[in-house]
Amino acid sequence: MGLSDGEWQMVLNIWGKVEGDLAGHGQEVLISLFKAHPETLEKFDKFKNLKSEEEMKSSEDLKKHGCTVLTALGTILKKKGQHAAEIQPLAQSHATKHKIPVKYLEFISEVIIQVLKKRYSGDFGADAQGAMSKALELFRNDIAAKYKELGFQG
């Protein structure tokens, strides 16, 4: 299920645009995630009290966490599938400390694609969307495999 060199190039090209505003993109991704899947908000003690989109938009903590999420994801994407060293601590913390189910990683992957589609419609066509989808699936599958090793049934 690996990606071709051309597919990785499409992923990294669009990710270059994301890196121009990691905090803004991250904030939009998290807000979109919480709106589409409100149950995911319960996993974030820091944000559970944010009930409205306006409260979410004005939360510096949410913006900061969005930046952290997309920074970590960018580091993983740049490894072009050779990301075992980066996946291990992420899987460890998400399985044992945060207890984030793989399903929630699917949700955020879908949201990332939707946000990129909305922001970069001209540069994020069907081929680029397909490549990003494959890259995010590879990431999720590798996280899920680590979860299994750790005995987490998420």
Curated annotation (Swiss-Prot):
Q: Where is the signal peptide?
A: none
Q: Where does nitrite bind?
A: H65
Residue list for modification Phosphothreonine: T68
Q: Per UniProt, where does O2 bind? A: H65
Q: Where is the Globin domain?
A: 2-148
Q: Name one GO biological process term.
A: response to thyroid hormone
Pfam families to which the protein is assigned, alphabetical? Globin (PF00042)
Q: What class of enzyme is it?
A: oxidoreductase
The GO terms describing molecular function are: heme binding; metal ion binding; nitrite reductase activity; oxygen binding; oxygen carrier activity; peroxidase activity
Family matches, as PROSITE patterns? GLOBIN (PS01033)
- Give the similarity note: Belongs to the globin family.
What protein am I looking at? Answer: Myoglobin
Q: Which organism is it from?
A: Rattus norvegicus
Lineage summary: Eukaryota, Metazoa, Chordata, Craniata, Vertebrata
